[in-house]
Design a protein with these regions (language model features):
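Extracellular/periplasmic envelope-modification machinery, especially enzymes
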Residues: 1-178
Length: 178
């Protein structure tokens, strides 16, 4: 199929699986990966990055920023698993083991007591209408509870917003025009 696409669309299709070895090693896509230390080689972790595959997409930039600022971080990500303990979307939609992964992330954060936690996810995927009051918690409720818990422990919280969301699959939409 890619050989039948115009050059500009073929380039787009090739980047779909364009993950670096470190992104693959440090992103818990398979349920087997371990958290990765990023940045400077120091004794204590100063920040934790926690999120879904959108966090994983930021890995290289955060790794470089941590090195540049001489700080050490821990990277925890799992695809299709928002960093929202207690949240279950209506009708499921999580990868197997997401609640356990989030519990592990919270235990790790509580043990390390970093100065900051950076939460990164494809937030739109977990908002209404996917999040219903009949779920264990709505995404908003889970986010507020998490931020409160972390701040009560003296941890600063940063939430990275997602890139602008398109209601259409851009590559598919381009593809239908050829």
């Amino acid at each position: 199929m890619p050989e039948s696409l115009p050059d500009h669309l073929a380039v787009m299709s090739e980047t779909v699986a364009d993950w670096t070895p470190d992104q693959l090693r440090c992103g818990d896509l398979d349920g087997e990966s371990s958290p990765c230390e990023i940045g400077a080689h120091k004794a204590s972790v100063e920040f934790v990055v926690w999120g879904d595959s959108h966090a994983q997409a930021t890995f290289e930039a955060l790794e470089q920023a941590a090195h540049h600022s001489d700080t050490k971080g821990l990277f925890l990500s799992r695809g299709a698993c928002p960093p929202l303990p207690g949240f279950q979307p209506e009708g499921g939609g999580f990868v197997l083991g997401c609640p356990a992964f989030n519990e592990y992330a919270m235990q790790t954060i509580n043990r390390l007591q970093p100065r900051s936690v950076i939460l990164i996810a494809r937030w739109v995927a977990y908002r209404y209408p996917h999040s219903q009051k009949t779920s264990a918690a709505t995404a908003e409720d889970a986010m507020l509870a998490l931020v409160h818990t972390l701040q009560e422990s003296g941890i600063r919280v940063a939430i990275m917003d997602e890139v602008p969301y398109s209601a259409y699959c851009i590559p598919s939409t381009f593809g239908t025009g050829i």
